[in-house]
Amino acid sequence: PNNLLDLAHKKKGVKAAVVNAGKPLPMLSVQDAVNENLIEPIFIGHEVEIQKCAEDIKWDISKYELIHVPLENDTAKIAAKLASEGKVKIIVKGHIHTDVLMKEVLKREYNLLGKTRLSHIWHMTIDKEDKPLIITDGALNVLPNVKTKMHILRNVVDFSHRIGIEKPKVA
């Protein structure tokens, strides 16, 4: 959505660990993000698959770092380690099972959790609609109690404010 791109363009692109980008959709998404100067990728995964996928879309990724890691579980470990060491600011989920990635990211040894409860936010836009639909915690906080719901609500309201929604509607 243009409003999110406008907000993002006000900031410098960030280093991003791209986990298993060796499939068309993740690679195209990363290419779009690079073209918009949103991220500088570090590709993590099977080198041959990543290179072939980039070649298939006619994108020369030779100027970006590529860490050859053949096993899915190990790609998540490398991404979490890079984030923990401050070498990347974000982790981009490519073609990797969410539970595999989250299992690593949530490990205490990486110290990636902030002081608030972690929750999942899905920002969705609908054609010809100005307002986004933001859905939270489809799978991360299953059967939350009232206290957990309050944390989730705080996270999504804070997120909404950061993307320019002054008075988000919550249901």
Regions found by a protein language model. Name each.
Residues 1-171:
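Anion-binding alpha/beta catalytic cores of soluble intermediary-metabolism enzymes, centered on
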